Amino acid sequence: MPRYALKIEYDGAPFAGWQRQAVLPSVQGAIEAALGRLEPGPHTIAAAGRTDTGVHATGQVAHCDLGKDWDPFRLAGALNAHLKPLPVAVVAAARVGEDFHARFSAIERRYLFRLLARRAPEVHDRGRVWRVPHPLDGAAMREAAAHLVGRHDFTTFRAIGCQAASPVKTLDELTLETVEVPNGVEYRFRLRARSFLHNQVRSIVGTLERVGAGAWAPDRVKEALEARDRAACGPVCPPQGLYLTGVGYPADPFAAT
């Protein structure tokens, strides 16, 4: 059966996460239903990352096996026609080999977290940023973030129910960009690693926000990391500011699209 890789964007607000649910709406369920309108099913798609409820994506990657050969451009268009009016779009499709797996072939994943420091409520970005009503110290957050880059035991920064075999991960990148917005500042955290633990990004950003607010000293983040204790973590921030922005592979399946 021919295999196709799909690059997908979605607004996570109306979904109970990526993974198919028995009753609640999911991104996986929406795309599998769209595939079922193209070919008889059942269809199962596998994704590079199973994003949680409310988490968005601009560069999710999934793969599916279909019963006939499709022109990738036409496949993306047909899926988008059947996904309307849901906030999900297949932005690219590509034919790949049967050894390609969206999750297990990936060599890096990239996330963006948008944190807005502004007293006034967000309007145009409601549901797409995490807003806090107090100012933040960007320099202090950068100083604290530097302690987390590299290979570490991230037990402190993973969910209690995380099913990963090991808490040891290599965080290749954690950068912070500041953007002036009307009457506030948006802080954009960019994180890159081969893989992440459950709630790792939201735990890190929630902790760094405490540093920015002055509730934590930057060195306390290093102490929390070395404690290897979930109780040492700061608060887990809400999901709406988090975006899966890209997935890397040894060879880009979408290079020719």
UniProtKB/Swiss-Prot annotation:
Biological process annotations from GO: tRNA pseudouridine synthesis
Binding site for substrate: Y111
Cross-referenced CDD domains: PseudoU_synth_EcTruA
EC annotation from Swiss-Prot or TrEMBL: 5.4.99.12
InterPro entries referenced in this protein's UniProt entry, alphabetically: PsdUridine_synth_cat_dom_sf, PsdUridine_synth_TruA, PsdUridine_synth_TruA_a/b_dom, PsdUridine_synth_TruA_C, TruA/RsuA/RluB/E/F_N
Chemical reaction(s) catalysed: uridine(38/39/40) in tRNA = pseudouridine(38/39/40) in tRNA
Keyword tRNA processing included in the entry's annotation: yes
Active site, UniProt feature: D52 (nucleophile)
Alphabetically ordered keywords of this record: Isomerase, tRNA processing
Pfam entry (one): PseudoU_synth_1
Gene Ontology molecular functions: RNA binding; tRNA pseudouridine(38-40) synthase activity
Role, per record: Formation of pseudouridine at positions 38, 39 and 40 in the anticodon stem and loop of transfer RNAs.
Subunit structure of this chain's protein: Homodimer.
Record-stated family: Belongs to the tRNA pseudouridine synthase TruA family.
UniProt-listed NCBIfam families: hisT_truA
Descriptive protein name: tRNA pseudouridine synthase A
Source organism of this protein record: Cereibacter sphaeroides (strain ATCC 17025 / ATH 2.4.3)
Lineage: Bacteria, Pseudomonadati, Pseudomonadota, Alphaproteobacteria, Rhodobacterales
Gene: truA
